[in-house]
């Protein structure tokens, strides 16, 4: 049977009847808001400009200013507020990094509290710390390194949080301008299984529906996903959905507290007594998702609770799936899922009774060695019922960090060009004709492969735009050893990390970047629901920080001045015009000018009426 999250103990049941969740472990929204205001008291005016004019940098849900495209009202969450200080803090003292030994052992939170990186700095092997240099010296020295390094021995990595599409685009273009396809970004690490399975099955690599489809659908199922934590504003959508009669099911080993009951601070009733989110919890064992899904599908097919008309008109391979499911035995399925057949029947009955449904998944599904297969199972479940290409239905991978959807679409992957086009000789020739310079046609390193190459001594330059491999990849000691072997490491960032303090093979550089809000000519990000949104430039100058895309562009043309005219993208406006030409489904990006300007590529629903590119 499915479990009821809301009856775990008497104390919890009592707390739901007490105002503000007294006695419950829950976010203290109003207290924390006051704390955030105090932290930003030295720059409150700028903080307000960010909140009222900028696109949220907290997650991939997509809020422009304080409003969105799903429901009316003011939208603000603690994820966004907790990041506010990163955008308002003053510069780090110029001499703070002269001896980094004094900073060893400090947490990344403590390092961030030192302030913004404000000036280009370099640390040579054997030196105790970093010393300030001019931008001209930094560009000239790094340009010479790239000139003297075979392209196969240099690599670029781009983080996901806070990065705009312009930065993704320029990172991949600069890398390929300098002859390498070794470029990757953090978003691929999170949802590569989703991309692979969706491309293969549907011919697309993004959510098929919109957030509006949550409100009014019969059922939402969350697989390995915790939107209350990852996209807090989405709890407002779930509050509205519950009021409209939507049932919510969660398939996850752990009953996430925020998905059990959430206190939406902007809704009086919810702020007082909370909103019960999950109706049915299916506590699969870790890694048991595929077995559970196969059991559910086995019942659906056996009982003929499927949409045969949809399957016959819009899919192929059903007979093969039917045969495979019929051969599965219940004993192994129950053992692997960690749930008995009655639980799978309970889920199958929920699916049977839901004419419309949205299936949502996140990293609890993708971060397994069999992540692609798990996503495939979710897609198969949705196709069996025809939950595709129409209102109140969809297959939705939840993205975490802001603008991660744009990473692959801008081409900041080692295996795809802009538009998600695979790297091969034919596509490289076409992109070379568009760019006017030769684009490499060989697949590059992923982030993990970059570290492997560094460990073997096969990587001479590693250029990181944000990010911290020590905190995102397994075996941090091994990662640190590999990073220390790279001759030249460049850390383009707004803040200091412990990764940047590792001694380099020869040189380590710190290049101070502007935030997304300070970025010249504004910036664009793409949300989970494929909404391309403009965030205007909110001027502020911290030391000598430069816009991230400008740093990358300047380095590329300094390294290869003989083809500088072919680089283009002299401004953010010109770059967006180029993106519209190179990535046709982003046509319209060139017309975005102010807060609230946006478009949703593909419209509210991809695969309309079940017709997919495949």
Positions of predicted regions on the chain:
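Cofactor-pocket helix-loop regions in the catalytic cores of large enzyme subunits
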Residues: 3-27, 115-403, 417, 428-611
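Metal-dependent catalytic core segments for phosphate chemistry
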Residues: 425
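Surface-exposed loop and adjacent secondary-structure segments within mature catalytic domains
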Residues: 411-415
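Intrinsically disordered, low-structural-confidence terminal and linker regions
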Residues: 1-55, 59
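Low-complexity, highly charged intrinsically disordered N-terminal segments
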Residues: 83-129, 139, 166
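N-terminal amphipathic, basic-rich helices that act as targeting or association modules
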Residues: 28-32, 44-98, 102, 131-135, ...
């Amino acid at each position: 049977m499915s479990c009821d999250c809301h009856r775990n103990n008497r104390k919890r049941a009592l707390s739901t009847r007490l105002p503000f969740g007294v006695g419950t472990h829950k976010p203290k929204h109003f207290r924390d808001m006051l704390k955030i205001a105090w932290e930003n008291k030295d720059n409150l005016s700028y903080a307000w400009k960010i909140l009222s004019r900028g696109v949220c940098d907290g997650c991939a849900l997509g809020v422009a200013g304080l409003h969105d495209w799903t429901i009316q009202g003011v939208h603000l969450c603690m994820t966004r507020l907790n990041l506010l200080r990163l955008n308002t803090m003053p510069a780090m003292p110029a001499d703070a990094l002269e001896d980094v030994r004094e900073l060893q052992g400090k947490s990344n939170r403590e390092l961030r509290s030192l302030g913004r990186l404000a000036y280009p700095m370099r640390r040579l092997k054997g030196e105790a710390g970093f010393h300030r240099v001019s931008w001209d010296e930094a560009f000239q020295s790094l340009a010479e390194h790239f000139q003297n390094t075979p392209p196969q021995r240099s690599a670029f990595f781009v983080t996901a949080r806070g990065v705009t599409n312009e930065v993704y685009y320029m990172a991949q273009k600069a890398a390929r301008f300098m002859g390498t396809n070794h470029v990757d970004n953090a978003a691929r690490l999170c949802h590569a299984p989703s991309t692979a399975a969706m491309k293969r099955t549907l011919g697309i690599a993004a959510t098929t529906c919109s957030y509006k489809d949550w409100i009014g659908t019969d059922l939402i199922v969350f697989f390995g996903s915790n939107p209350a934590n990852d996209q807090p504003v989405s709890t407002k959508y779930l509050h509205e959905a519950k009021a409209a009669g939507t049932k919510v099911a969660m398939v996850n080993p752990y009953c996430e507290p925020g998905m059990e009951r959430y206190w939406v601070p902007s809704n009086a009733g919810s702020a007082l007594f909370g909103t019960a989110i999950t109706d049915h919890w299916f506590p699969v064992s870790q890694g048991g998702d595929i077995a559970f899904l196969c059991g559910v599908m086995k019942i659906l097919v056996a009982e003929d609770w499927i949409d045969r008309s949809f399957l016959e008109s819009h899919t192929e391979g059903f007979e093969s799936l039917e045969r495979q499911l019929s051969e599965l035995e219940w004993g192994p399925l129950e053992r692997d899922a960690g749930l008995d057949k009655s639980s799978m029947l309970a889920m199958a009955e929920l699916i049977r009774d839901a004419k419309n449904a949205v299936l949502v998944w996140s990293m609890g599904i993708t971060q397994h060695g069999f992540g692609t297969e798990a996503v495939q199972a979710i897609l198969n479940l949705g196709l069996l019922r025809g939950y595709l290409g129409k209102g109140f239905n969809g297959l939705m991978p939840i993205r975490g960090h802001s603008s991660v959807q744009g990473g692959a679409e801008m081409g900041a992957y080692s295996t795809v060009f802009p538009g998600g086009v695979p790297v091969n000789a034919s596509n490289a020739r076409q992109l070379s004709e568009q760019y006017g310079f030769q684009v490499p046609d060989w697949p590059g390193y992923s982030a993990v492969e970059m570290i492997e190459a560094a460990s073997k001594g096969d990587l001479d330059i590693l250029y990181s735009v944000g990010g911290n491999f020590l905190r995102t990849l397994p075996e941090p000691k091994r990662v640190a050893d590999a990073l220390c072997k790279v001759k030249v490491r460049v850390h383009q960032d707004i803040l200091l990390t412990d990764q940047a303090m590792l001694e380099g093979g020869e040189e380590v550089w710190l290049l101070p970047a502007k935030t997304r809000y300070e970025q010249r000519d504004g910036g664009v990000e793409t949300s989970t629901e494929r909404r391309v949104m403009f965030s205007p430039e909110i001027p502020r100058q911290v030391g000598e920080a430069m816009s991230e895309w400008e740093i990358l562009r300047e380095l590329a043309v300094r390294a290869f001045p003989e083809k500088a005219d072919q680089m283009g993208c002299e401004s953010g406006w010109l770059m967006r015009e180029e993106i519209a030409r190179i990535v046709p489904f982003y046509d319209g990006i060139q017309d975005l000018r102010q807060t609230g300007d946006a478009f949703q590529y593909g419209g509210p629903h991809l695969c309309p009426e079940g017709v997919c590119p495949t």
